[in-house]
Regions:
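Active-site glycine-rich loops that stabilize anionic/oxyanionic intermediates
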Residues: 29-32, 36-40, 114, 247-248
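Alpha/beta-hydrolase active-site loop
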Residues: 80-100
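Short beta-strand/loop motif that positions the catalytic acidic residue
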Residues: 243-245
Length: 307
């Protein structure tokens, strides 16, 4: 059963859209809280959510501020309303609290994709007591050019205002990825090797929009917090952490950077950290050709850990 609702953000009162898929039969195994990536929306995760629901998992996802239905106007897509990373994390926290209130007896598995993978790590840095397992999907490796991106975003914001859409930062961030797959003749080819998925993404008004400087500053702050492992509270060191990514994902940079990302969570204090790369897959492994194997592997891992 699909359930849709919304809540007012504790950060600024913005209406945040939420969707849940509830299995038809009890008992439920656990709750999976999903956190989506940049320039997309929660409905893109319905196939994965349906798969998990059939296995007995309650699955909950919300639209980030400035995404999907969590906007005041359609023109606000890619604008975070000045709340920055902190407001995004507060929204994740609110959903997390609501889940625990509705299902106090169930374990909670937190999973984030791409930008969402940065957000979930920034979240557990302070709130890992609220999470029983963490799944990090399509994680961007730490980008040493981030300070330059921050400087550009701040300068553009000061000159043009927070709603200015930064084509410069967009090109700096994703231009290399587009070039890597230029033979596919799609600027979004780095997202997925399935041409139908790439085409649908390009044609959707809710996908692929250019971030404002306001949103880029939030993104950069999420990356900073996700990789600042020295400041993780790590009150739940036995929490299992699974990293899954496509080996051809340009956000990964390379295998060495992926391994470094996995090690970073171990340095943060977590004892049970595993990483898996999928050959031939790009950024959106949940939408890739062969995604059924990814779904299966994630489900097997959750069950192996007792969820």
């Amino acid at each position: 059963m699909k359930y849709e609702s919304s809540f007012k953000s504790e950060a600024d009162g913005l209406e945040i859209s939420v969707m849940a898929l509830i299995p038809d039969k009890k008992p439920y195994r656990a709750v999976v809280q999903l956190v989506h990536g940049m320039s997309e929306h929660k409905e893109r995760y319905i196939p994965f959510m349906q798969y998990l629901a059939k296995l007995g998992y309650v699955v909950v996802i919300h639209d980030h501020r400035g995404h999907g239905k969590s906007v005041k106007h359609q023109d606000d897509l890619g604008f975070t309303y000045g709340g920055g990373a902190q407001a995004m994390l507060q929204d994740i926290r609110t959903v997390n609290r609501k889940i625990h209130a509705y299902y106090p007896e169930l374990p909670l598995i937190l999973m984030g994709h791409s930008m969402g993978s940065l957000a979930v790590r920034a979240f557990v840095a302070e709130h890992d007591s609220c999470v029983d397992m963490l799944i990090v999907c399509g994680s961007p490796s730490y980008n040493t050019a981030m300070p330059l991106g921050v400087a550009i975003a701040k300068t553009e914001k000061a000159v043009f205002g927070p709603r200015h859409r930064s084509k410069l930062i967009e090109t700096m961030s994703f231009g290399a990825g587009a070039m890597k797959f230029r033979k596919d003749k799609r600027c979004t080819a780095w997202i997925c090797s399935d041409p139908d998925v790439a085409k649908e993404y390009e044609e959707s008004e809710l996908c692929g929009f250019t971030f404002t400087d306001d949103a880029y500053l939030a993104l950069f702050e999420l990356m900073k917090r996700a990789y600042d492992v020295e400041h993780f509270s790590c009150t739940n060191p036995d929490m299992p952490v699974l990293f899954v990514s496509g080996a051809e994902d340009p956000c990964l940079i390379n295998v060495r950077h992926f391994a470094k990302t996995v090690r970073a969570m171990r340095r943060a204090g977590y004892k049970d950290v595993k990483g898996k790369l999928y050959p031939g897959m790009r950024n959106e492994i949940l939408n890739e050709i062969g995604r059924e194997q990814v779904y299966h592997d994630i489900a097997v891992y959750m069950r192996k850990k007792g969820f």
